Regions:
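Metal-dependent amide/peptide-bond hydrolase catalytic core
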Residues: 23-31, 35, 235-420
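Catalytic-core environment of secreted peptidases
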Residues: 94-139
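N-terminal hydrophobic or amphipathic helices/low-complexity stretches enriched
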Residues: 20-60, 208-210
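Bacterial N-terminal signal peptides that target proteins for export
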Residues: 1-8
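A non-catalytic alpha/beta surface segment that caps or lines the substrate-entry region
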Residues: 49-102
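Acidic/histidine-rich catalytic neighborhood of metal-dependent amide-processing enzymes
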Residues: 128, 133-211, 251, 270, ...
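Glycine/charged-rich beta-loop-alpha catalytic/anionic-binding loops adjacent to active sites
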Residues: 120-131, 219-223, 389-393
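Bacterial N-terminal signal peptides
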Residues: 8-17
Length: 420
């Protein structure tokens, strides 16, 4: 009974919140909405089981197909319409609206950061579940399923159409390829609001942290460390570049970062390597700051090449000059929204009435794409607690209020799409 009273209060608040004045309000006496919220609490075990089972289906970068097929099956089993996998691997399910209300997307990403062969067996210790990917983003996928199920079973009628999506390519070199495809083709011009459920917790990101990522390679003929001594060395050039990058000064606000995350090169201790490479990541929510650090890094890369080639005189060295290639492995757009934006105010109002507070921030997620296109979008957490994201020791804690994640997502979707 207490849950039903809380749900009614939440629904009433959302109905009158300034954030949704332009939307079809969620009526405070809507029994279907209250039933959906109650179900998401009482069926928390069901949601958790989806999370466990999906985690144990490997989904390495660019290899999400097995998990996608299972996700398609589960969405179809809920009775959603037009459930299909598009040409890049996104799983899309449609729940048609009753009128001409806003179109809302609720999405979680299928891919993980872990390579093929990673053991993804879930181990349970009390309320703690441990496995690579259990939080990022199998929690999000489970929440999307839970909300879709609650809407179906409670019989909620939304004015606008709601799409439930499991998308590919969110992580790393996936470069948001699933979202780029969706917003560039099948759903171009059709989406009014986008919500990504990514990771655990109850945070909200309304800003898009942009990033530039490069794979940089220095190449030369290489040779014996003693016999060929005196020719330019790709590893030395790489070292010069890394040292220069490490000394770059960046602003604290807006937070701007850089990182050399991977280095490769060399065959033996007594060889001058024929090549050396590194992967560089730089991030900022501000386009100007990102462009500035990008310019500094590119300058340093060229200076390192010139310095290493100039270091060694003579015709032998001149014939063995190094070259450099810079391959782009990821570009994520920046973007921002005011806290007064309807989608943000709706999310904050829903959180408040569910009894928790949260603050807006910025992150790099699927929401980057719609935000950069001027489409209102946010990333929210799926409830519970995540530890050790992107590590083999990743874990998810099923906290006493973890059901708030699915409830929050459901309220936001209902308020934005409108409920009859």
């Amino acid at each position: 009974m207490k849950t039903r009273l809380l749900s009614a209060a939440v629904v009433a608040s959302i109905a009158t919140a300034p954030a949704v004045h332009s939307q079809t309000p969620v009526p405070s006496n809507n029994p279907s909405m209250r039933a959906a919220l109650d179900m998401l609490k009482t069926d928390n075990t069901w949601t958790l089981q989806q999370q466990i089972e999906l985690t144990q289906i490997p989904a390495p970068p660019f290899n999400e197909s097995k998990r996608a097929a299972e996700y398609q099956r589960r969405l179809a089993a809920l009775g959603l319409r037009n459930v299909h996998i598009d040409s890049v691997g996104n799983v899309i399910a449609e729940r048609p609206g009753t009128g001409k209300g806003p179109t809302v997307v609720l999405a979680g990403h299928l891919d993980t950061v872990f390579p093929p062969g990673t053991n993804v067996t879930v181990h349970r210790n009390g309320t703690t579940l441990s496995a690579p990917g259990i939080g990022d983003d199998d929690r999000g996928l489970a929440v999307v399923l839970a909300v879709a199920r609650a809407f179906q079973k409670s019989g909620i009628k939304t004015t606008g159409t709601v799409y439930f999506i499991g998308d590919v390519g969110e992580e790393g070199q996936g470069n948001l390829r699933g979202m780029r495809y969706l917003f560039g083709t099948e759903m171009k011009g059709k989406v009014d609001y986008f919500i990504s459920v990514d990771d655990a917790g109850l945070g909200i990101a309304s800003g898009a942290v942009g990033s530039n990522r490069y794979h940089v390679t220095y190449k030369g003929p290489g040779g014996h460390s003693y016999g060929a001594f005196g020719i330019p060395n790709p590893i030395h050039a790489l070292g010069r570049a890394i040292a220069g990058i490490a000394d770059i000064q960046v602003p604290t606000t807006p937070k701007t970062t850089f990182n050399v995350g991977v280095i490769q090169g060399g065959t033996s201790v007594n060889s001058i390597s024929g090549s050396a490479s590194m992967d560089i990541d730089m991030r900022s929510p501000d386009a100007k700051s990102l462009a500035e650090v990008n310019e500094k890094i590119l300058r340093i890369l060229h200076q390192a090449l010139e310095a290493e080639n100039a270091r060694w005189p003579g015709p032998r060295a001149a014939a063995a000059k190094l070259t450099m290639t810079i391959d782009t492995i990821g570009i994520r757009p920046t973007g921002s929204q005011s806290d007064d934006a309807p989608i943000v105010k709706t999310a904050l109002s829903a959180a408040h009435m569910l009894g928790f507070s949260t603050r807006t921030g910025a992150s790099s997620t699927d929401a980057n794409i719609p935000i950069s296109l001027g489409i209102p979008g946010i990333r929210i957490g799926g409830g519970g607690e995540e530890r050790g994201a992107h590590s083999l020791g990743e874990s998810y804690v099923d906290t006493p209020n973890s059901y708030l994640g699915p409830q929050w997502a459901a309220l936001i979707v209902a308020a934005l799409a409108g409920v009859q």
